């Protein structure tokens, strides 16, 4: 699990290995993200940037609009939660990134997604 707070936007992520959807050389992980507006000004998530690293040091960058087809607008005190997935070639790695947020007044900033592990249970000492 990881948590980061940037300008009142809290991002918490939990990841889970999905053995039923994995096979040798293809390890599927789901991750659930909770984005909460703990600040005093509404903000909208407009885009995402993920950096995915595997155990071989391979790096993949994923950039796109919104999350799961949405660009959630969060009033103070509101939160948005979604689940997505990632496939690695190795049994462990990590993800991190940012969400581009825009306040109702037009101020844009990047909310940090702190690094979180993607690990097949029993593969690390």
From Swiss-Prot:
A Pfam family the protein falls into: DUF525
Domain of life: Bacteria
Domain called ApaG: residue spans: 3-125
UniProt cross-references to InterPro entries, sorted A to Z: ApaG-like, ApaG_domain, ApaG_sf, Uncharacterised_ApaG
Name this protein carries in UniProt: Protein ApaG
Organism encoding this protein: Anaeromyxobacter sp. (strain K)
Source taxonomy: Bacteria, Pseudomonadati, Myxococcota, Myxococcia, Myxococcales
Gene label: apaG
């Amino acid at each position: 699990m990881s948590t980061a707070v940037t300008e009142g936007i809290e991002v918490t992520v939990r990841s889970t290995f999905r053995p039923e959807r994995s096979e040798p050389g293809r390890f599927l992980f789901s991750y659930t993200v909770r984005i909460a507006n703990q600040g005093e000004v509404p903000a909208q998530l407009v885009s995402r940037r993920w950096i995915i690293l595997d155990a071989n040091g391979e790096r993949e960058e994923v950039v796109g609009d919104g999350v799961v087809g949405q660009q959630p607008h969060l009033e103070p005190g509101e939160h948005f939660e979604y689940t997505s997935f990632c496939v690695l070639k190795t049994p462990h790695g990590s993800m991190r990134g940012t969400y581009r947020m825009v306040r109702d007044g037009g101020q844009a900033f990047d909310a940090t997604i702190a690094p979180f592990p993607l690990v097949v249970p029993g593969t690390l000492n």
